[in-house]
Amino acid sequence: MAIERTLSIIKPDAVAKNVIGQIYARFEGAGLKIVAAKLVHLSRGEAEQFYAVHKARPFFKDLVEFMISGPVMIQALEGEGAIAKNRELMGATDPKKAEKGTIRADFADSIDANAVHGSDAPETAAVEVAFFFPGMNVYSR
């Protein structure tokens, strides 16, 4: 398997629960390295731009409102098969359907407040990492 990078966002609900460290421990326990990270409070414009792919979807407005409701922890993860590994750690989008022991099963409250975001493919990962971390701010280790 190839070394990949993926974007992960710990959403406002999980940041408010003070579980960033527990989520980071899961990333590292799965062999993923944090190669860039920052705690930010997204502006409406940033959230709308980042989630523009969902603009026509009925949940877009609520998603943007949720993502600007509090700080988020954004990180680029690197490792063998990082995209699939991160998605496995996250669990199903709906925490009620997420497998026991996944981030969403353990820390999310609803399909809307579902604790984390993760890139779904190599192409989106490249775009999403570049959105938050220009190349000079990502460091392989």
Curated annotation (Swiss-Prot):
<protein>
    <recommendedName>
        <fullName>Nucleoside diphosphate kinase</fullName>
        <ecNumber>2.7.4.6</ecNumber>
    </recommendedName>
</protein>
<dbReference type="GO" id="GO:0006228">
    <property type="term" value="P:UTP biosynthetic process"/>
</dbReference>
<comment type="similarity">
    <text>Belongs to the NDK family.</text>
</comment>
<dbReference type="GO" id="GO:0004550">
    <property type="term" value="F:nucleoside diphosphate kinase activity"/>
</dbReference>
<keyword id="KW-0479">Metal-binding</keyword>
<keyword id="KW-0808">Transferase</keyword>
<keyword id="KW-0597">Phosphoprotein</keyword>
<feature type="active site" description="Pros-phosphohistidine intermediate">
    <location>
        <position position="117"/>
    </location>
</feature>
<keyword id="KW-0067">ATP-binding</keyword>
<keyword id="KW-0418">Kinase</keyword>
<dbReference type="InterPro" id="IPR023005">
    <property type="entry name" value="Nucleoside_diP_kinase_AS"/>
</dbReference>
<dbReference type="InterPro" id="IPR001564">
    <property type="entry name" value="Nucleoside_diP_kinase"/>
</dbReference>
<feature type="binding site">
    <location>
        <position position="11"/>
    </location>
    <ligand>
        <name>ATP</name>
    </ligand>
</feature>
<dbReference type="GO" id="GO:0006241">
    <property type="term" value="P:CTP biosynthetic process"/>
</dbReference>
<feature type="binding site">
    <location>
        <position position="93"/>
    </location>
    <ligand>
        <name>ATP</name>
    </ligand>
</feature>
<dbReference type="GO" id="GO:0046872">
    <property type="term" value="F:metal ion binding"/>
</dbReference>
<dbReference type="InterPro" id="IPR034907">
    <property type="entry name" value="NDK-like_dom"/>
</dbReference>
<dbReference type="GO" id="GO:0005524">
    <property type="term" value="F:ATP binding"/>
</dbReference>
<keyword id="KW-0546">Nucleotide metabolism</keyword>
<keyword id="KW-0460">Magnesium</keyword>
<comment type="subunit">
    <text>Homotetramer.</text>
</comment>
<feature type="binding site">
    <location>
        <position position="87"/>
    </location>
    <ligand>
        <name>ATP</name>
    </ligand>
</feature>
<keyword id="KW-0547">Nucleotide-binding</keyword>
<keyword id="KW-0963">Cytoplasm</keyword>
<feature type="binding site">
    <location>
        <position position="59"/>
    </location>
    <ligand>
        <name>ATP</name>
    </ligand>
</feature>
<comment type="function">
    <text>Major role in the synthesis of nucleoside triphosphates other than ATP. The ATP gamma phosphate is transferred to the NDP beta phosphate via a ping-pong mechanism, using a phosphorylated active-site intermediate.</text>
</comment>
<feature type="binding site">
    <location>
        <position position="104"/>
    </location>
    <ligand>
        <name>ATP</name>
    </ligand>
</feature>
<dbReference type="GO" id="GO:0006183">
    <property type="term" value="P:GTP biosynthetic process"/>
</dbReference>
<feature type="binding site">
    <location>
        <position position="114"/>
    </location>
    <ligand>
        <name>ATP</name>
    </ligand>
</feature>
<dbReference type="GO" id="GO:0005737">
    <property type="term" value="C:cytoplasm"/>
</dbReference>
<dbReference type="InterPro" id="IPR036850">
    <property type="entry name" value="NDK-like_dom_sf"/>
</dbReference>
<dbReference type="Pfam" id="PF00334">
    <property type="entry name" value="NDK"/>
</dbReference>
